[in-house]
Structures are given as structure tokens and as C-alpha cells.
Amino acid sequence: MLRIIMRSIFLLAIVLTVATSLCFAQAAPEEGGNEIQIWAGGGHSVAGGRGDTGAFNAGLRYGWILTDPHLPSILRGRFEYALDAVPVFLIFQPANTSYGVGFDPLGLKWNFVRRGRLSPYIELTGGVVFTNHEVPAFTNTVNFMDQAAFGTHILGEKYNWSLEVRYMHISNAGLANLNPGVNTVQVRLGIGKFFIRH
């Protein structure tokens, strides 16, 4: 399984390298632009679900900046729609460590206007994760994820870093008789860029 995870990470690195070589960099999100990012994050369970559970995941994001700036003052920003492919998803629970893959087809992101080198954002995402063991134990191997995050892009000349705090709820949504769910708070780090295709 470790070999599969390492191959997945290597493949993500190749895809990001090729994709970014086809793009032109820009300093911050702009209407008509796109975002590509490779990211990794992890955290631990919090109250509201099964405890003593940790999570680590890594993936690739592609986003579309859909609007010019809207709203007044500190709320001013642009709307982005994003997709995440998550080829590395580990859940460390008392019974075992589950390995899986996930996909987040619903990423709703609000990129606040740039403040110096910082471009803060908030986002809501939803998706599905498939694991080799039941998560939590005695439930199901297919689960849904809903997430909320607050973070910032640290803008660079060529690439941007992102740092965020993310709340993730994992639940089978009633696919199994038991549905206790797992709630985690995670820290996620990413590297990517905003670009416009010409």
C-alpha cells in the first residue's frame, strides 16, 4: 500500500509540473483565471463523533475564478469553483489504519481581495471517500465529507503557498445502520499558482 501512495504522490508532482509549465503566472485570483495546487494536510478528531482518530490526506486541486470582485469593504472578493482529487487518504483509528481515495466535486471558495502578499479565503467543500476498512469501525467503507476552511494564499512571484485550518466531517449519511461520523480539525499546506490561459 505504501508503494501505491508513493506512486500517487509522484504522479501528482508530475501532473502539477506539466500543468504549471503550460500556464502563465499571475499574482492573485482574477476573473477568468484558474488555480492549480498540490496540497497535504492532517489533523485529529474533535468532539461530536468518534474520538481517538487522526487523518492525513494529500491531493490536487483545480479551480475556476468565476467573478470580478463583489461585496463591500473587508468582504470584497471573488467566487471560485474548485475540484479536488484526493489519491492519498489515511485515517488512523484505534481498530486499524484505513487507506483510501477521495474526490471533492463541490468546492465553493471565496477569495478575499489581496492584502499585500496575502490573499485570504474561506471555503466549503463536499465529496466522497472510499477506504479499505470501515470508517469508523463497524460502519461503512464509503463515506461522505463536508468541510469548511479558512486560510490564506501567500503570494509569490512564480508560485503561491497556502496555509489553512480545515474542519472535516466524515459520515456515511445513513448508508449503514451505524453512523457516528468522524470530525477532525486539520492544518493544510499547499503550493500552486493562479494563471490565465492565453
Give the label of every model feature segment.
Residues 58-131:
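Gram-negative (and chloroplast) outer-membrane scaffold detector with strong preference
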Residues 32-34, 52-58, 97-104, 118, ...:
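Residues that define the transmembrane beta-barrel architecture of outer-membrane proteins
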Residues 25-33, 67-79, 113-119, 155-161, ...:
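Short loop/turn motifs that connect adjacent beta-strands in outer-membrane beta-barrel proteins
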Residues 43-49, 69, 86-94, 128-135, ...:
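Sequence/structural signature of outer-membrane beta-barrel proteins
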Residues 34-40, 77-85, 120-126, 161-165, ...:
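Transmembrane beta-strands of outer-membrane beta-barrel proteins
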Residues 24-67, 179, 184-198:
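Short glycine/proline- and aromatic-enriched beta-strand/turn motifs that initiate or cap beta-hairpins
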Residues 38-42, 58-64, 105-110, 124-128, ...:
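Residues on the lipid-exposed face of transmembrane beta-strands in outer-membrane beta-barrel proteins
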Residues 1-30, 196-198:
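Cleavable N-terminal export/targeting peptides
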